[in-house]
Amino acid sequence: MTITNDIRYIGVNDHDIDLFEGQYIVPEGMAYNSYAIIDEKIAVMDTVSADFGEKWFAKLQDALGGRKPDYLIIHHMEPDHSANIDKFISAYPEAAVVGNAKTFAMIDQFFGSGLCKNKLAVKNGDTLSLGRHELTFLFAPMVHWPEVMMSYDGADKALFSADAFGKFGALDCQDKEWDCEARRYYMGIVGKYGMQVQAVLKKAAMLDIKMICPLHGPVLTGDLSHYMSLYDIWSSYGVESEGVCIAYTSVYGNTKKAAELLAKKLEERGCKAAISDLARCDMAEAVEDAFRYGKLVLATTTYNADIFPFMRQFIDHLTERNYQNRTLGFIENGTWAPAAAKIMKAMFEKSRNINYIDTTVTLRSAMTEENAEAIDRMAEELCR
């Protein structure tokens, strides 16, 4: 696939994968992107996952048209992008492997020392001329590994962004809607590192970028302000959409009834409510919603003098990703010693700028008329 006259797409689609990184459900598969810049000198940008080495290598050879590459540029050492470095070096021993000091340390860890005999170590801001194309290297540490770097091609004004601006899904399954699976990808993979993403966005703002070539998902072209704006919101932990995320667990259905009643009361007031059963949903979708909306209500039971395991796991996912700048409410259920609200609130003690609504709803087994009235008050408070 030709992206520009000189930039060729040589990535692959993976429809065999069920869990990305061993945890994220990817019903539409995954794309492992790789690119080749064909100029006076040829640069190959990253490799692909191990299972697709032969397919990738065939696409690479087709793009080369009988020529030999001069460089293999490693933006990110995660194995879904680096697994075929050894195969590339075996086929093209005269090509230089381009990376930074941390890149080469990781190559030694994954492949053993001595693999890269011809290497070019670059620093932040260094340039590499291919002829018409000149690449500028921009370090992006912890987006989302410490060795990550991006490169900017001044000729075609393309940013090779590593995992940033990626999304779930194979390229032959992409629809027009980018935001949802890009958001789920960002919150799951990169969400913890908002400060580092903000630093990269500041670097990107200094460049004239016409296209973004990520390591997952489609090449982004046209008006890039939408994607940049979302990344700015996500990485600054801002509120993307007005609404309330309701996440619940329920043992016998009573807490579920309370959560569903709250959703109904919110919608009656014209407020968007996104509700998730944490025991049955894709938890990454629930995490996505918790970061998308400005308000979050957690509903669960006291369980073994703690909270229900799926709720604890969910809150851990949020706090590990620096959940902040949100308004929270609690619905708790306990037959003899309800303590879930207190326990959940304590889990957010180190989170920044978390506000709590006044109303906490406490069920003692089944929902009562008094509980229903409290839920109505909670909905009213959340809609202010």
Describe the predicted segments one by one.
Residues E40, D51-V98:
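Active-site metal-binding motif and surrounding structural segment of the metallo-beta-lactamase
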Residues N84, D282-A286:
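Short acidic active-site motifs
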Residues A247-R269:
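Short, charged N-terminal beta->alpha structural module
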Residues T2-L60, M150-D153, K157-S161, T255:
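Conserved beta-strand hairpin/beta-sheet module of binuclear metal-dependent hydrolase folds
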Residues L171-I212, H216-V219, L261-S276, A286-R384:
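FMN-binding flavodoxin-like domain, especially the glycine-rich phosphate-binding loop
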